[in-house]
Amino acid sequence: MLEQVILFTIIMGFLISVLLSPIFIPFLRRLKFGQSIREEGPQSHQKKSGTPTMGGIMIIFSITITTIVMINKFSEISPEMFLLLFVTLGYGLLGFLDDYIKVAMKRNLGLTSKQKLIGQIVIAVIFYAVFHYYQFATTIRIPGTDVSFDLGWAYFILVVFMLVGGSNAVNLTDGLDGLLSGTAAIAFGAFAILAWNQSQYDVAIFSVAVAGAVLGFLVFNAHPAKVFMGDTGSLALGGAIVAIAILTKLEILLVIIGGVFVVETLSVILQVISFKTTGKRIFKMSPLHHHYELVGWSEWRVVVTFWTAGLLLAVLGIYIEVWL
């Protein structure tokens, strides 16, 4: 029965995204919600200017409807499900405001860094407040073992850091057609397996709902992309995957399963540090996916390579937790 629920969930998430996209994409185009391309980015990206953005709305809609329908039919809204939906919708709303300012108000930078950071922290603090209210464990466990450590009040700092950092890391990965959609689908699929292994079936249902929604979106986001998810989608996905890691006590394993997001972020950090300290850049451009573009790789080759890396890291993460 539960296996059928999981199958129905991913199919439903996929179909909602696929069927909604042909309606929603022309609507975004009529509103002239087109992506502006930075001049300092790769020149090959300039032809993408005007491609409809804010497609993350479709992903979030699919996730929300699919999750609520499946949970109401086969279970009930648990505290875990509430937290997952809250983070997804909260970070999605923050991303929506950022995108709206960019495309509707023609302010290419969107929200200021300070405004976005404050929003991310506020959502993370509310998440932890609810988390604490329901007395979820403040322990952190070493993957593949029963060894855990209670961080006490320090867990609050970890949660806020993970949600803010994780949402930004996923956001940085959304730079090529289909790159984030593919890597996210893989990562959420891995967490679905691990949540299922822990008998956290509501978290598993949510995870496959996200995977299905993102795969449906990928049909229209793969190269050449007909729509971008924007910060609306990337921040929502980032917050969601971190929340899943926290609720399944797989915070450490997130670094492996989400390894592509981690490496992308580290490439930006190292680039900034190197330039400020030595005046030289380590990469031709950061995040890392742009570096490979500028050394001559085709966009599709970069994307498939990163998908492959994400898949291998996901398999490694599952192996460590389940079979090691």
UniProtKB/Swiss-Prot annotation:
InterPro entries: Glycosyl_transferase_4 (IPR000715), PNAcMuramoyl-5peptid_Trfase (IPR003524), PNAcMuramoyl-5peptid_Trfase_CS (IPR018480). PROSITE patterns: MRAY_1, MRAY_2. Its cofactor is Mg(2+). One of its GO terms (molecular function) is metal ion binding. It comes from the Bacteria. The keyword Protease does not apply. This is Phospho-N-acetylmuramoyl-pentapeptide-transferase. Pfam families: Glycos_transf_4 (PF00953), MraY_sig1 (PF10555). Its main location: membrane. GO terms for cellular component: plasma membrane. It is found in: Cell membrane. It comes from Bacillus pumilus (strain SAFR-032). Belongs to the glycosyltransferase 4 family. MraY subfamily. It is a multi-pass membrane protein. Catalyzes the initial step of the lipid cycle reactions in the biosynthesis of the cell wall peptidoglycan: transfers peptidoglycan precursor phospho-MurNAc-pentapeptide from UDP-MurNAc-pentapeptide onto the lipid carrier undecaprenyl phosphate, yielding undecaprenyl-pyrophosphoryl-MurNAc-pentapeptide, known as lipid I. Pathway: Cell wall biogenesis; peptidoglycan biosynthesis. The chain crosses the membrane at residues 5-25, 51-71, 77-97, 117-137, 147-167, 176-196, 203-223, 227-248, 302-322. Its EC number is 2.7.8.13. It catalyses: UDP-N-acetyl-alpha-D-muramoyl-L-alanyl-gamma-D-glutamyl-meso-2,6-diaminopimeloyl-D-alanyl-D-alanine + di-trans,octa-cis-undecaprenyl phosphate = di-trans,octa-cis-undecaprenyl diphospho-N-acetyl-alpha-D-muramoyl-L-alanyl-D-glutamyl-meso-2,6-diaminopimeloyl-D-alanyl-D-alanine + UMP. The keyword Transferase applies. GO terms for biological process: cell division; cell wall organization; peptidoglycan biosynthetic process; regulation of cell shape. Keywords: Cell cycle, Cell division, Cell membrane, Cell shape, Cell wall biogenesis/degradation, Magnesium, Membrane, Metal-binding, Peptidoglycan synthesis, Transferase, Transmembrane, Transmembrane helix.
